[in-house]
Amino acid sequence: MRKVLLDLIKKTGRYFFKLAMKNYVIFKPVLGFVNLETRSRFKMWVLRLAFKALYFRKPNFIFDMNLEKGITLVGYPYAAIGEGEFLRQTARVFLKSNINFGIHNFNFGMQSSENNKSLASFIRSDNPHLINLFHLKPDQFEAFVVSLGNSFVKGRYNIGYWVWELGDLPEAWISPIKYFHEIWCPSRFIQSAVSKFVAEPAIYMPPALEVEDSKGFDRSYFKLPKDRFLFFFIFDFKSSFFRKNPMGCVRAFQEAFHKSDKSVGLVLKSIGGDQYPNEFSKLNEAIRADSRINFIDAIYSPEEIVGLMSVCDSFVSLHRSEGIGLSIAQSMLLGKPVIATGYSGNIDFTRSDNSCLVDYKLIEVGEGE
């Protein structure tokens, strides 16, 4: 009787959870007076409570051998963010290696554009495979399990493969991390952070990266000057304005080149500025008086992003911390000289012999950063 009642509670909870997520846009005006950070914290608190009370279970090694030998990738295959590209690169490796796989699109709370449909034919709602590979952070994994229940993971070998950008893990992640049989770490920096907090195997698994030189784009397409040496930086406001540090790029550019020097320019490409009006306004104010700086806050196709990288001359990332640094790596693959902070995930591939590394001094992460 207790089991039947518990299953009923779970089923009812999942129904209302999915209903709330499906109609989230309806509730946004009502929640407008509550800032984004407070809403996010409340949402995660509710999820964590439900996860611990109803769904948490340590992984065992009893597997359903009637399942297909293959892998189900879980994450954001359509999203125009680093996590989306990370999953897509993994899927391309499986394709080239003839590995049987499918993709489950989990767009819980997705606030970024979902315009990359390159893997749409591999999307499926069921899960016939023995192995799950989660391109989801532990808090996102909690939302996934609460939304779909334990059936998606039961009897399967569950691997976590996510990006994290700081040297320590959030304490709230420790419980859901224990759900995985093993964890893959795409950089030594992430491996070091994970290994300090968990007993599960933390395996260094660098991502496969490739980028095709996008043809058909020139500077006129992006309304950029033809006769200047252009430095380039790209970021998502949602990925932490302070961590990505575009203001550092602006300051460094203006200190390095006098305002009368018209032989150089800086291109800043972002998405999500409308969701972070304070940071958006701060950046606009910093560049307002400098006509050499082009600021583009818009959704581009994957081809346009590569095209924009291609027509610029050098990539600059004065980040405070990166889990991997996908944009840095993509620029290097395009043959662009890179200037980057000599710290965090990117030092796996940015070295003193192939990049211009910038010295740094570690500071405490401030509240709200």
Give the ranges of each region predicted by the language model.
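Extended catalytic core of nucleotide-activated donor transferases of GT-like folds
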Residues: 58, 72-74, 105-194, 303-304
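Nucleotide-sugar donor-binding and catalytic loop/hinge architecture
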Residues: 60-69, 121-125, 215-231, 258-261
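Conserved donor-binding/catalytic core segment of Leloir-type glycosyltransferases
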Residues: 72, 224-244, 250-254, 266-268
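Nucleotide-activated donor-binding/catalytic signature segment of Leloir-type glycosyltransferases, i.e.
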Residues: 278-306
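Short alpha-helical donor nucleotide-sugar binding micro-motif in glycosyltransferases
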Residues: 306-312
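Short hydrophobic beta-strand element within catalytic cores of glycosyltransferases
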Residues: 337-340, 356-357
